[in-house]
């Protein structure tokens, strides 16, 4: 019974707040114009197998998951760390399985 009263009180509060002047008087046209003027904030992503050492969170997304910036030391005596965007194997297998299931069911 107490849960019902809490939910009802919450709904009444939300409805009264949404109908009040607290939200503002933005009309649909004004809101659409604001959205049209909004600039894209996302910077260009780093493609798979390209260097991501400048920004380790800039890797692009695959069809389902975001690639991960993986750093390693290459063989050959050079102690310089190399970072590239790569897809983890478990995510690669999950994408392949999902694609096969989609192909089976249409």
Curated annotation (Swiss-Prot):
Which cysteine-cysteine pairs are annotated as disulfide bonds in the entry? Answer: 45-60, 52-69, 59-85, 71-83
Q: Tell me the compartments it is located in.
A: Secreted
Major place of residence: secreted
Record's comment describing the protein's domains: The presence of a 'disulfide through disulfide knot' structurally defines this protein as a knottin.
Residue span(s) of the pro-peptide: 21-41
Q: Which Pfam families does the UniProt record give?
A: Toxin_35
Q: Which UniProt keywords apply?
A: Disulfide bond, Knottin, Secreted, Signal, Toxin
What lineage does UniProt assign to this protein's organism? Eukaryota, Metazoa, Ecdysozoa, Arthropoda, Chelicerata
One GO term describing the cellular component: extracellular region
- What name is this protein filed under? Toxin-like structure LSTX-D4
Supply the PROSITE patterns for this chain.
SPIDER_CSTX
Which family does the record assign?
Belongs to the neurotoxin 19 (CSTX) family. 02 (D7) subfamily.
- Where expressed (tissue)? Expressed by the venom gland.
> Organism source for this protein?
Lycosa singoriensis
InterPro entries per the record? Spider_toxin_CSTX_knottin, Spider_toxin_CSTX_Knottin_CS
Q: Point out the signal peptide segment.
A: 1-20
Q: List the molecular function annotations (GO) for this entry.
A: toxin activity
Q: Which domain of life is it from?
A: Eukaryota
């Amino acid at each position: 019974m107490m849960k019902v009263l809490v939910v009802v009180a919450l709904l009444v509060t939300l409805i009264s707040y949404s109908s009040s002047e607290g939200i503002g008087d933005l009309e649909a046209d004004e809101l659409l114009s604001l959205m049209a003027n909004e600039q894209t904030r996302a910077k260009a992503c780093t493609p798979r197998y390209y260097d991501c050492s400048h920004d380790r969170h800039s890797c692009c997304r695959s069809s389902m998951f975001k690639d991960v910036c993986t750093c390693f030391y290459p063989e050959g005596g050079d102690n310089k760390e190399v970072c590239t965007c790569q897809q983890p194997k478990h995510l690669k297998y999950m994408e392949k399985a999902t694609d096969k299931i989609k192909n089976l069911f249409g």
